[in-house]
Amino acid sequence: MADAMDLAQLREQEDRERHISNARSRRHEVSAFICEECDAPIPEARRRAIPGVQCCVTCQEILELKSKHYNGGAL
């Protein structure tokens, strides 16, 4: 028999999966084939996984780190 913690974890997992599904279905943007920052090709797997992607992984990481830094986030 499931206890309260098991039920809470199941509910949390279901919520997370629902949120991921909703986020993926909302995006109908066209992905770029070439990174807008460095002109490197963006792999097909990345374009399929993240609809609307405009940057390669490396450039996206740099943009996120800069954003975190400029917005006062800790590095």
Curated annotation (Swiss-Prot):
InterPro entries: Znf_C4-type_bac, Znf_C4_TraR, Znf_DskA_TraR, Znf_DskA_TraR_CS
Alphabetically ordered keywords of this record: Metal-binding, Zinc, Zinc-finger
Biased composition (Basic and acidic residues): 9-20
Source domain of life: Viruses
Sequence segments annotated as region (Disordered): 1-23
Short name of any one Pfam family annotated for the protein: zf-dskA_traR
Zinc finger (dksA C4-type): 35-59
GO biological processes: positive regulation of secondary metabolite biosynthetic process
Keyword field contains Transport: no
Protein name (Swiss-Prot/TrEMBL): Uncharacterized 8.5 kDa protein in gpA 5'region
Top-level taxonomy: Viruses, Duplodnaviria, Heunggongvirae, Uroviricota, Caudoviricetes
The gene coding this protein: CP80
